[in-house]
A protein has these predicted regions:
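HTH-adjacent hinge/linker in prokaryotic transcriptional regulators
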Residues: 1-28
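Glycine-rich phosphate/diphosphate-binding loops that line cofactor/substrate pockets in enzymes
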Residues: 28-40
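A short, charged, Gly/Pro-tolerant segment at domain boundaries
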Residues: 173-191
Length: 191
């Protein structure tokens, strides 16, 4: 394959991932998830492996709007954090499979503590989805050989961006003020 053909192939994979996710994503589930986040004392953006990086990216995007968004490191720290949650807290967990042992330990512990769970996943019948209060589907299909592909990651980040935009639009006065403050704070970092 030529480089031009590879570029076209990669482009098609990104479009397929985003389009599949847009078609699978429920507007009602987005609204419900954002409502939970707005009402929460804290929102913990969590994941394992490559999904933890995506959760961190989503958390960083929300950081310009509120200090209530947090991450919690590796699976051990996530489990410790989950044990200290209560009914005022929300977990936003990213997991393509929705079926990993570490994720289930963390989600069960958070649920037992009273926290609400929002799961970004591809599988609506996964163990994690069955435990979640809200499931946000990433519709992009991935084979085991493509594990952690960048188009799939982009599809999850697309869902994260939808959440951020809904969060901002539901409270524009606060969001505008927060963005002004954080933008001003970052100006000193520019050359």
């Amino acid at each position: 394959a030529t480089t031009a053909e590879l570029c076209e192939h990669a482009y098609a994979r990104f479009l397929t991932a985003i389009n599949g996710t847009q078609n699978a994503l429920s507007a009602e589930a987005v609204d419900e998830a954002v409502h939970l986040m707005q009402e929460a004392r804290q929102v913990f953006c969590l994941g394992q492996g490559g999904s933890m990086l995506l959760a961190n990216d989503i958390c960083a995007r929300f950081a310009s709007l509120s200090t209530k968004f947090r991450t919690a490191g590796d699976s051990h720290l996530q489990l410790l954090t989950a044990s200290l949650m209560n009914e005022a807290d929300v977990v936003l967990f990213v997991s393509y499979s929705g079926a990993t042992r570490d994720m289930m330990e963390t989600l069960r512990t958070a649920k037992a503590a009273g926290a609400k769970i929002i799961l970004l996943t591809h599988y609506e019948d996964s163990p994690g989805a069955l435990l979640a209060d809200v499931v946000l589907l990433c519709g992009a299909q991935e084979s085991p050989l493509d594990s952690g592909s960048i188009p799939i990651k982009a599809a999850f980040l697309y869902v994260g961006e939808v959440l951020v935009l809904r969060y901002m639009l539901d409270d524009p006065a606060h969001s505008n003020t927060a963005q002004d403050l954080t933008s001003e704070a970052l100006t000193v970092k520019m050359l």
